[in-house]
Amino acid sequence: MANETNTFSLNRKTQYLAAAVNDNVPYIQASRSYLKDKVEGKKCGLTYNFYFPDPGKAYAGTSEVDITNDLKVVQEREVSCTLMNARTSVELGTWERLTEIESFVNEVAEPRGMTLGTEIEIDSITRGWKVSDGARVVAAADLGMDDLAGIAADLKAIRSRGKFRGFADPSFFHSLGAKNLSLFLPSDIMREIYRSAFIGNYMDVDWVSETYMPTLSVTGTMTSAKVTEIGTDGVSVTGTNLYAGYMFELPNAYCVDMFGRKTKQKKVFIVDSVNGAGTAGKLSQRIVCSTGNAAEATAVQTNCNTFGTFGSICTSGLTATSLITESGDYSIVQARDADALEWDTYKHPSLAGCEESTQRVGKITCQVAKWANIATRQQVMRIDVPYISQMIDGRRSRLLVIKL
């Protein structure tokens, strides 16, 4: 009976931990599970390639009858996802001493859950915002509701069928003023999910206050960058004073919609990483070169997305036009389709000799293992939150870059 009681207590405490983490990850609440059945047996820290179906090409017209030259196989996009893990630990004496739920929640679950959730949130945002196909730059003094309406319109133009979410630092909403904030429409459903972080709906985007949206600090004189390589493993650029988050456009490169059709929006490329000297950068987004269908014969040369169709721009030596041309701090605001973010949890293998519990609440799966170190006679609780967080489609994300 004692073991049964202890097991129940461990499960209950693990559940409260999972709930506390789930309360502190607003960014990943706007996500979709694509890989739940594909990660079983996969190992933390390793990167795996997964494949997502493409809508393919369609043809219409009086001459579009012969399918001889049509592609006979389903197109698939390859996306690399790394299995991540967030962890913390608690000394067993603290864990066992707190037998009342309220005390445990206040002293262990909430503070540890907030810490774990914060790390997951920062990791997801840091990697996620850079997978965006479009951006608008505006000075803080000129910021208005038209700018929010603009990125909402950009998202609608790509004909995405999901629900749009927007994330910005709390100071951004404060800068809009009470009059403009009154234009955001309330939603009981969103309020239940995001609680006090939910601002409201504007132009079909549900806006959420998120403390960890990044601020770019740009220093030094920015010279024109050059594209040195475009391939299936990404894009390489060289320049001066490059930085992670450096945004640029290429000549005649435009965004495409969900069906591969060219839009009027210029395609934006965002650098993931740079060398220590800031002279070389890399975009990890895969790019595939191909020809278009007959209806796109003239437009295919300028069609471009992170995994889609290029024509003539699949060459090196192109001059990159920088979106940010002045030194200073720039606040990043992101609006995206919730389905553009892949989020899944998985389970670590059981540890022999440990008492364990695994519980899921909302988007979070929490694993707790209890064990003793014979050498030190110390007993410890290990808490893990294994996860996959990966933006899989830059077409469905837009940025508002605000010069502070």
Please give the residue ranges for each predicted region:
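Short helix/loop capping segments that flank catalytic or ligand/cofactor-binding pockets
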Residues: 58-61, 175-178, 258-259, 390-392
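N-terminal "assembly arms/tails" that initiate or stabilize quaternary assembly
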Residues: 1-78, 397
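Short, Lys/Arg-rich flexible segments
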Residues: 2-35, 93-103, 112, 117-135, ...
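Autoprocessing Asn-cyclization modules and mimics
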Residues: 175-291, 401-404
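Beta-strand elements of well-folded, non-transmembrane domains
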Residues: 54, 252, 385-389
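Short solvent-exposed strand/turn elements
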Residues: 279-316
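Long, contiguous amphipathic alpha-helices that act as assembly "spine/axial" helices in icosahedral shell
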Residues: 50, 77-147, 156-171, 195-197, ...
